[in-house]
From Swiss-Prot:
Locations listed in the record: Nucleus
Region feature Basic motif, mapped onto this chain: 134-147
Protein's name according to its UniProt entry: Transcription factor BHLH094
Keyword Lyase: no
Biological classification of the source: Eukaryota, Viridiplantae, Streptophyta, Embryophyta, Tracheophyta
Boundaries of every bHLH domain copy: 134-184
Keywords per UniProt: DNA-binding, Nucleus, Transcription, Transcription regulation
Any one biological process term the GO annotation gives: regulation of DNA-templated transcription
PANTHER family: STEROL REGULATORY ELEMENT-BINDING PROTEIN (PTHR12565), TRANSCRIPTION FACTOR BHLH089 (PTHR12565:SF321)
Gene Ontology, cellular component aspect: nucleus
Gene of this entry: BHLH094
Family statement drawn from the similarity comment of this UniProt entry: Belongs to the bHLH protein family.
Subunit and interaction comment: Interacts with RSS3. Forms a ternary complex with RSS3 and TIFY11A/JAZ9 in the nucleus.
General function of this protein: Transcription factor that forms a ternary complex with RSS3 and TIFY11A/JAZ9 to negatively regulate jasmonate-responsive genes.
Length: 256
């Protein structure tokens, strides 16, 4: 207990009660002194007391001196001892916590080091080690074969179309091929129209002439309209009109 409240209580007590309290305190002091003296003769002071015990004894002595050696000294020693015990226990708990934290940190680091890295996902295709610019899987190999076939077909078309070898680029080559095919289509249509006109004129001329003028030479339209293998060369060199006049002239010469 704190000595200050006990002193205040003594000041407010009546005079006769105060004398009685002083007498009782003297008796208790004498008894405690006699006990202490007897005990001092029997017990030896501990030489192996630590610094904490020395501090505790100092606190107890100072509290006893401030209390005036009264009966409240024994009561004031108990709270101080109780205060020091929780302080010691809290220090021990803190040290245990720090040790546990360091142990857990070391164990977590060791677990991270011992943990094996995750395996990479397996690929559906077999990876082939190839040079730079070469395909490494089946899909790219098939695409490469398809592109090679397309390039071969383009080369064949370039050889067929005159002047297409000078063009660079697949798009421009295809444009040249399309234009050439369209021009051939127009030429074929024009030639078919001319042939129809020639056939109509020839049929009208045959009907106008009498049959006795021809004699024994029958007119064969198939022979008159036969095409020589040199006609394609002549068409490439000259115009279509010249070729038609040439064919018509040959047909009339054979008829006559």
């Amino acid at each position: 207990m704190d000595p200050a409240p006990s002193l205040a209580a003594e000041l407010w007590r009546p005079h006769h009660h105060r004398h009685h309290f002083e007498a009782s305190s003297v008796v208790t002091d004498q008894g405690s002194g006699s006990r202490g003296g007897g005990g001092s003769g029997r017990r030896r002071p501990r030489s192996d007391a630590g610094p904490e015990d020395d501090d505790l004894s100092k606190v107890v002595s100072t509290s006893a001196a401030s209390g005036g050696g009264g009966g409240g000294g024994q009561d004031s020693d108990a709270p101080e001892a109780k205060r020091l015990k929780p302080m010691k226990s809290s220090d021990k708990n803190d040290s245990l916590r720090t040790e546990a934290g360091t142990d857990s940190g070391n164990s977590s680091k060791a677990a991270d080091k011992n943990a094996t890295p995750p395996e990479p996902p397996k690929q559906d295709y077999i990876h082939v080690r190839a040079r730079r610019g070469q395909a490494t899987d089946s899909h790219s190999l098939a695409e490469r074969a398809r592109r090679e076939k397309i390039s071969e077909r383009m080369k064949i078309l370039q050889d067929l179309v005159p002047g297409c070898n000078k063009v660079i680029g697949k798009a421009s080559v295809l444009d040249e091929i399309i234009n050439y095919i369209q021009s051939l289509q127009h030429q074929v249509e024009f030639l078919s129209m001319k042939l129809e006109a020639v056939n109509s004129h020839m049929i009208n001329g045959i009907v106008a002439f009498p049959s006795k003028d021809f004699g024994a030479q029958p007119y064969n339209t198939a022979a008159g309209l036969t095409f020589d293998p040199q006609t394609t060369r002549e068409f490439a060199q000259g115009s279509t009109s010249e070729w038609l006049h040439m064919q018509i002239g040959n047909a009339y010469e054979r008829v006559t």
